[in-house]
C-alpha cells in the first residue's frame, strides 16, 4: 500500500513540476528530387543561401526562392533524400572551419578533412558567403608578390591584393605557373590556398606530393572538389577557399589563393541553375554568372592600414578553347580582374616555357608594386620584344632585312632564350635583375643563340659564387636606380665573364 502511495506521489509531483516547452520548427516536404537538387514546399520563410536539414541529417542550401517551391541543392548523395522527406529550416548559413590548423591539410568544399589526418577543431568557423571589403577598407596595391618567374616579375608584375588571371588552352602550363608562385612564397610569410575545381584526384595528389617535397605544404591549404564530386560542392569550393583566406587576411597576413579553374566552376553553376529551372542565357549560362565571379574575386583585396593591412592575392585560372579569349566566361573574368597572363599553345609547343604571349598579357596595377631597380632593369624589355614580334611577322614573307633589322631579330631570339625557365626553379629578385641587365645593356649580342642556356646557367652560378661580384650585387638598393659608377663596375665584371665564356674558359 505504501508503495502505491509513493508512486502516486511521484506522479503527482512530476505533473505539478511539468514545464511544457514548445519547439517551433519551420518544416516542409520534398516534392521532387533528382540530380542533386530537391524542390521543397512549405518553408516559405527560408532565406537565400540558408542551410536546411533533411530527415537523415543531410544538409542542403536554399538557392532558389519561388512563391510555391524552394530549390535546394543537396550536399550529399541524392540517394539519401526521397520524395516526401521532411525538411527543416536551420536559420543559419553555411560556414567552414578556418584557422592555422588548416595549414598543410587537404579538405573538401565543406571543410571536412580528406587527407586521412587528424580531425579539425570546429570551434572556429566562418561563413562561406561574406561581403567583399568596402572601398574605404582598401588601399592601393603597393607591395609586390614575387612569383620567381622572370617573364612575369619583369613584364606582368603582380602586387599583393591584385587579381591576375592566368588564361590559355589546356596543357599550356597554367597550373605550373600557379604552383611555382606557391613554391616561391617559401620564407616570405605568405599563406597559400589552392582550390582545385573539377580536377582529377590523381593530378591534385601529384601537386600535394610536390608541395610536400619542396617544403611548401606547411604554409598551404588545398581544397579539393574533384571531377567526381557533385556540382554543388564544385560550386561552393572557391567561396570556401575565399573564406579560409579572409580569416588570415583579417589577421594582418598576406595570402595567395589559386582558383584552378573557374571555367569548371562556371560549368558547375550552369548545371545547378538549369536543374533549378532558371532561364538560360548566352551559352546556356545563367544571367548572374558574371555576378558569381565578380563577387568571388572582389573578396581579394589589399586592406587599409586601419584594417590591419592584410591582403589576398588571387590567381584565377581560365581554360580557353583553341585560344578563343572572346568567349563568354573568358571575357567576363578578364573584365573583372586586374590583368591577365595569356599562355599560347604554339609557344608552348615550340619549347618556349613559360609560354606567355607578351602582346596579350598585361598587369594593370602590379607595376606600382615593382621596386625601382626592377622597373629600371626591365624598362626596355617590352619594347625590344614588341619590335622583334613586328619584324618577325614581316620576315615570314621572305623580305630582305637590313643589318639593323637582323640585329633586332637576333636579339629578340636571344631574349626569348633568356626568358625560358624550368618549372620548380624560381629565381630570386637579385638573379632576375642581373639577367635583365644583360638584356638592357645589349650584352647578349656577343653570345650565340644556341649557347644562351649554358651561359645563363653559368652566369647565375657566377653571380652566387664569385665573392667580389656577389658583394657588389648584394649592395644594390632595390628602391633606387643603379648609380653610374656602380653600374660601370658591374658591367665590367659581366663583360669579362662573357669574354671568358666565349673563349671556353667557363665551365
Curated annotation (Swiss-Prot):
It is an enzyme of class 7 (translocase). The keyword rRNA-binding does not apply. It is a peripheral membrane protein. Signal peptide: none annotated. One of its GO terms (molecular function) is ADP binding. Its main location: membrane. This is ATP synthase subunit alpha.
Amino acid at each position: 500500500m505504501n508503495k502505491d502511495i509513493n508512486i502516486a506521489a511521484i506522479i503527482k509531483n512530476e505533473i505539478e513540476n511539468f514545464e511544457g516547452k514548445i519547439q517551433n520548427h519551420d518544416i516542409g516536404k520534398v516534392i521532387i528530387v533528382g540530380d542533386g537538387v530537391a524542390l521543397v514546399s512549405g518553408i516559405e520563410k527560408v532565406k537565400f543561401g540558408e542551410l536546411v536539414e533533411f530527415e537523415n541529417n543531410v544538409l542542403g542550401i536554399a538557392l532558389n526562392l519561388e512563391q510555391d517551391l524552394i530549390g535546394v541543392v543537396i550536399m550529399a548523395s541524392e540517394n539519401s533524400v526521397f520524395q516526401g522527406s521532411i525538411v527543416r529550416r536551420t536559420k543559419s548559413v553555411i560556414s567552414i572551419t578556418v584557422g592555422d590548423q588548416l595549414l598543410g591539410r587537404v579538405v573538401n568544399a565543406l571543410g571536412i578533412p580528406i587527407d586521412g589526418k587528424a580531425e579539425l577543431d570546429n570551434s572556429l568557423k566562418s561563413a562561406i558567403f561574406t561581403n567583399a571589403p568596402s572601398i574605404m577598407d582598401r588601399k592601393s596595391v603597393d607591395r609586390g608578390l614575387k612569383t620567381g618567374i622572370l617573364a612575369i616579375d619583369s613584364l606582368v608584375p603582380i602586387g599583393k591584393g591584385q587579381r591576375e588571371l592566368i588564361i590559355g588552352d589546356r596543357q599550356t602550363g597554367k597550373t605550373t605557373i600557379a604552383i611555382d608562385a606557391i613554391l616561391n612564397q617559401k620564407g616570405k610569410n605568405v599563406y597559400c590556398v589552392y582550390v582545385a575545381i573539377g580536377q582529377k584526384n590523381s593530378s591534385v595528389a601529384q601537386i600535394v606530393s610536390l608541395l610536400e617535397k619542396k617544403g611548401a605544404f606547411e604554409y598551404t591549404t588545398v581544397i579539393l572538389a574533384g571531377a567526381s564530386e557533385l556540382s554543388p560542392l564544385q560550386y561552393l569550393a572557391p567561396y570556401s577557399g575565399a573564406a579560409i583566406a579572409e580569416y588570415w587576411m583579417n589577421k594582418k597576413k598576406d595570402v595567395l589563393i589559386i582558383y584552378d579553374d573557374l571555367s569548371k566552376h562556371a560549368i558547375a553553376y550552369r548545371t545547378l541553375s538549369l536543374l533549378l529551372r532558371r532561364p538560360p542565357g548566352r551559352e546556356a549560362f545563367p544571367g548572374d554568372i558574371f555576378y558569381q565571379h565578380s563577387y568571388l574575386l572582389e573578396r581579394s583585396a589589399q586592406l587599409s592600414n586601419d584594417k590591419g593591412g592584410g591582403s589576398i592575392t588571387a590567381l584565377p585560372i581560365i581554360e580557353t578553347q583553341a585560344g578563343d579569349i572572346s568567349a563568354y566566361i573568358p571575357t567576363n573574368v578578364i573584365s573583372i580582374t586586374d590583368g591577365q597572363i595569356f599562355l599560347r599553345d604554339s609557344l608552348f609547343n615550340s619549347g618556349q616555357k613559360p609560354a606567355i604571349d607578351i602582346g596579350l598579357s598585361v598587369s594593370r596595377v602590379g607595376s606600382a608594386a615593382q621596386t625601382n631597380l626592377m622597373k629600371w632593369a626591365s624598362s626596355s624589355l617590352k619594347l625590344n620584344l614588341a619590335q622583334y614580334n613586328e619584324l618577325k611577322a614581316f620576315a615570314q614573307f621572305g623580305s630582305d632585312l637590313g643589318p639593323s633589322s637582323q640585329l633586332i631579330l637576333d636579339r629578340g631570339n636571344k631574349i626569348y632564350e633568356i626568358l625560358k625557365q624550368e618549372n620548380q626553379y624560381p629565381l630570386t629578385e637579385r638573379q632576375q635583375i642581373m639577367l635583365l641587365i644583360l638584356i638592357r645593356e645589349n650584352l647578349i649580342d656577343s653570345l650565340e643563340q644556341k649557347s644562351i642556356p649554358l651561359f645563363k646557367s653559368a652566369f647565375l652560378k657566377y653571380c652566387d659564387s664569385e665573392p667580389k661580384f656577389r658583394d657588389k650585387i648584394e649592395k644594390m638598393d632595390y628602391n633606387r636606380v643603379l648609380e653610374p659608377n656602380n653600374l660601370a663596375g658591374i658591367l665590367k665584371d659581366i663583360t669579362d665573364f662573357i669574354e671568358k665564356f666565349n673563349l671556353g674558359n667557363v665551365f
